[in-house]
């Protein structure tokens, strides 16, 4: 039987977790759920444990990338065949997990849930952010030769070889955890497929990035992509 781990990074999500975990259990009750409490100041970890999930508490906030890396380390050490990363705030519809896993069944090594794929382009995004996302998508296409409609989506599934890779290589910087990870996987020679998903409003709570200057962070990401070219080249060399 294929062992699958659901990885859920969470920062101060005590309000949204009960409904999110309940809905998740209705879809994937047979899979293990790991909630990574990313230095929360509320009762996120306790709520996760009471709901039957495995809870890992970080002593301070690492950010989504750091939390996901912890989850991938856990999956690697405990022999999971596949891992799925999903938000704790309820914006990712757990029903999308089925499509992500089916993509792996059909040969993908990694599957990305796209908010902007055909038939799902109804996710509200501000003009500046949308333009920045398109620009990043163009960079990824230039570097990998593959077109992606949503390079910053955090709703993803990984097969075992990619778990092994990203458990040691997963970026921890904000936004790099999605875009740079995608580049790392493609440069290592793995196949990445997109599947359409739908996003929903948060179940509760306040977005942790509400006050983040997205323009500055996108510029930092661009600099990071340019600065990490040697690491990706090493991965491509290792694959060859």
For the regions a language model picked out, list residue spans one by one.
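A conserved acidic beta->alpha catalytic loop
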Residues: 37-45, 90
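Short beta-strand-to-loop acidic/aromatic patch adjacent to the donor-nucleotide binding site
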Residues: 80-91
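Catalytic donor-sugar/metal-binding loop of nucleotide-sugar-dependent glycosyltransferases
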Residues: 147, 170-173, 182-200
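Acceptor/aglycone-binding surface of glycosyltransferases and processive sugar-polymer synthases
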Residues: 58-77, 94-175, 202-212, 216-219, ...
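Donor nucleotide-sugar binding loop of glycosyltransferases
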Residues: 13-16, 40, 93
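Short hydrophobic beta-strand elements that form part
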Residues: 5-9, 57
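Cell-envelope/extracellular polymer assembly enzymes that use nucleotide-activated donors
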Residues: 3-5, 180
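Short, well-formed alpha-helical segments that are part of the catalytic scaffolds
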Residues: 12-26
């Amino acid at each position: 039987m294929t062992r699958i781990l659901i990885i859920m990074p969470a920062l101060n999500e005590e309000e949204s977790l009960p409904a999110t975990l309940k809905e998740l259990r209705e879809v994937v009750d047979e899979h293990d759920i790991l909630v990574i409490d990313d230095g929360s100041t509320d009762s996120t970890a306790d709520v996760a444990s009471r709901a039957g999930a495995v809870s890992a508490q970080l002593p301070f906030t690492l950010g989504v990338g750091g939390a996901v890396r912890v989850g991938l380390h856990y999956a690697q050490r405990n022999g999971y065949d596949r891992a799925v990363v999903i938000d704790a705030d309820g914006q990712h519809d757990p029903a999308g997990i089925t499509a992500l896993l089916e993509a792996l069944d059909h040969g993908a090594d990694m599957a990305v849930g796209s908010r902007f794929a055909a038939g799902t382009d109804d996710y509200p995004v501000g003009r500046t952010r949308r333009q920045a996302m398109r620009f990043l998508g163009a960079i990824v296409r230039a570097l990998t030769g593959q077109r992606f409609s949503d390079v910053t989506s955090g709703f993803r599934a990984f097969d075992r070889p990619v778990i092994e890779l990203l458990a040691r290589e997963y970026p921890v910087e904000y936004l790099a955890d999605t875009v740079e990870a995608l580049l790392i996987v493609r440069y290592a020679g793995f196949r990445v497929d997109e599947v359409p998903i739908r996003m929903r409003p948060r179940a509760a709570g306040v977005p942790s990035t509400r006050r983040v200057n997205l323009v500055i962070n996108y510029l930092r990401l661009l600099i990071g992509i340019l600065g990490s070219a040697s690491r990706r080249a090493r991965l491509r060399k290792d694959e060859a």
